Amino acid sequence: MLGNAMVEACPAEGDAPVPITPAGRPRSGQRSYPDRLDVGLLRTAGVCVLASVMAHVDVTVVSVAQRTFVADFGSTQAVVAWTMTGYMLALATVIPTAGWAADRFGTRRLFMGSVLAFTLGSLLCAVAPNILLLIIFRVVQGFGGGMLTPVSFAILAREAGPKRLGRVMAVVGIPMLLGPVGGPILGGWLIGAYGWRWIFLVNLPVGLSALVLAAIVFPRDRPAASENFDYMGLLLLSPGLATFLFGVSSSPARGTMADRHVLIPAITGLALIAAFVAHSWYRTEHPLIDMRLFQNRAVAQANMTMTVLSLGLFGSFLLLPSYLQQVLHQSPMQSGVHIIPQGLGAMLAMPIAGAMMDRRGPAKIVLVGIMLIAAGLGTFAFGVARQADYLPILPTGLAIMGMGMVCSMMPLSGAAVQTLAPHQIARGSTLISVNQQVGGSIGTALMSVLLTYQFNHSEIIATAKKVALTPESGAGRGAAVDPSSLPRQTNFAAQLLHDLSHAYAVVFVIATALVVSTLIPAAFLPKQQASHRRAPLLSA
């Protein structure tokens, strides 16, 4: 597939491979590259950054809007979380197809098609009349956004060449880091000033600009001979994940996991996922995801760590803005500003993590990162349980979490491919990228379900919904309130705050426990650097 673009971008076979998802094949023949970053390359990088930042910012923007969706659509957190879950499932679906699609259509056309799909999805989201259509249109966005990062890397790898790739990726990485910092602020400001629909409408001029610039700047490339696509694998994995998560997400409304409306889709989804695993294991030619890579112990441990870590991490991240808005009574704009310490922590740790990984290899820095995430998330949970004000506990926890993310996510991607042969790097990178998205999608659904369960078991919160004391109240939407249902105690507001804080604290503690559990597989990651060891080759 188009994994050759990444392999040729590596200076030497013995060097540590770059942990990315490839999607481009260079043209046959030799090509000479200048040593400096010329104007043409910087223009190409600028277009790639414009589109990729748009997709990255959109994720953080939508997380800030979760409570607004609950109020405007009269829905629950478990249902609204599908605006994130559906998007991440779409990412997990298209990432394995990126290499085949770029071979089939060419990287230039695929990039432009992905930008167009994301922009069209943004427009549809902006006009969605109900939560169901908003979720569906978010999936459309995800199909476009999932292609942008791997295709952008393939284009940059082809245009930069091996000697300039590191420098151009450093240039590209700066605005990519600013996305998670600026996204919550932008989203909060747009929601407060113009309404939630503008968090999607703002993508239209950016997407159209990226589309026009790509048509002008990117060199034309012809489609190449592509591998046979694993349609069966795609038809098993995507519906399996969606059906399983739909069943789990239905449990709060049913009151029990034993309800048939929960069990039937959950069991059906698990059966489809099991069938996908069996299909991928025995498919010898070009499976959607090469499950045989799990025979490599380092690959198995890195992917297990990434999946569970994403489950706890992404699930808790979804609820951070909701907690700030619902319990601390912050506006969307304020909650966006108060999440900034997380991005600042990540920016601070980036150069340190990179230097440590180069000197020590990924295993040790991954352990440090996981411990930092657990410490930060635990600190945040402690502040929530104590009903603490924002300062100083909560920003401290967020900053530590941000540092831990940088020290764990990227090194884990490196650990997943460092023992693979060059021809296996593409598949290994795809595998861990998919598991990151799958873990994140399960985490967003699971944590929202747990929070909804906590809400449903609180009589105070249930009463508050009726009297418009929470954003999802019936009275707030014009429903009649029976005065006899109101509580007699005088400290109702204090008790409501206690129950809300307790509900969020329980979920954050569970997320912390999941993060801590990843120390077990992470402890067995290979301690040597890639240049010091090479695992036996698996079959191609």
Swiss-Prot record:
Molecular function GO labels: transmembrane transporter activity
Coiled coil: none
Transport among keywords: yes
InterPro entries per UniProt: EmrB-like, MFS, MFS_dom, MFS_trans_sf
Alphabetic keyword roster: Cell membrane, Membrane, Transmembrane, Transmembrane helix, Transport
GO cellular component: plasma membrane
Pfam families linked: MFS_1
Topology within the bilayer: Multi-pass membrane protein
Domain of life: Bacteria
Record-annotated membrane-spanning stretches: 45-65, 78-98, 117-137, 171-191, 198-218, 229-249, 262-282, 304-324, 337-357, 365-385, 390-410, 431-451, 505-525
Keyword Transport: yes
Protein name: Multidrug resistance protein B homolog
Native source species: Mycobacterium tuberculosis (strain CDC 1551 / Oshkosh)
